[in-house]
Amino acid sequence: TVTVTIPSSTIPGNYILISRANSNNVVVESNTTNNLGFSLLNVFTPPITDLTVANVMIPDTVMLGYTMDTARWVIANLSAEEARGYTSDGIYLSAGNLFDSTATLIGIKNKNINLQPLRTDTVKLAPLVTGVVEGNYSVFVKTDLLNQLSESDKDNNTGISATPVYVKVKELPLNVNELNTLHTISRYYKLRIPDSLYGSTILVTLKSNDSLTMKNEMFIAGGYVPTPANYDYGYEIPNYGNQQIVMSDVTDSVYYIMVRCVSPNPLVQNITLKAVKLPFAILNVHTNSGGNIGNVTVRIRGSLYRDSMVAKLSNGTTTIYASAVYFTNSTQVFATFPLQGRPLGVY
């Protein structure tokens, strides 16, 4: 059985409904000329109804990146005709009390409706809350979102919650391991920076129990919720499960963190997030080898670097000073070491 929706723009009249078996030719057949079926179909204009939305009921708080538990609203048929067909209700978050272009669509409830005259029906949905910042929001519900039903009045299709919902972001405390799971839904966190740490360097790490096969990404923004297209700091290593971000000279009181998995058909991961204040430190070195027939330039990532810093290699008996140190910022420098004729070994 296949259910199809006849477009509302279809002109009433008599039609032939054509169906075809094995339409994508996946099954090998000896004869494909008998795969078509035909049926006469009469399309008529449905009676005009009038739907309204009332009693939008919502929780008082919801976490960003989690589902709302649970939104409910009442659809009423104010007409003398039966409202019948396939329709969609949309649920929106609005920072004000107006339903306009600034409202964010967070969920759509698709349903078959068969509502008798002057009757009501309660609809519920647990939408995923994304695309907004922290704060209070009015919740709007618009019925027949795609204009699939004929109605006498489309201006009364929207209802608003009596009280707002507060969208919160889960907090990531400094120096605390935050355990969570990561699958197909992005996770969001809020990192508070006290006044005493303004100007510091903060390291945020993401560790996965499946770092070699999963592909994770992390984005951070100061004062607003980041997206993959809009952020202040981004992950370092593509196609890898573990990620880290070094934020130098932090100046915002709140940073928002977005973590997502971009692997196709991913498994549920156990992840650990942690944010720490970095002292002067070397986090990693690229490249980590070089021949003793000339110069080698390496990238050194870390924290609290200065333009006047010195870099050297040492193995306990031999010290090799960098001939040049190229300062990029307080988290990265490039150092060139003259290795011509130097003893082999680990430094």
Question: What do the predicted segments below correspond to?
Answer:
Residues T1-S196, S211, D252-V254, V262-K277, ...:
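Extracellular/luminal regions of secreted and cell-surface proteins that mediate adhesion/ECM remodeling
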Residues L197, D210-M214, S303-S308:
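Short proline/glycine-enriched turn/loop motifs at strand-loop junctions of beta-rich domains
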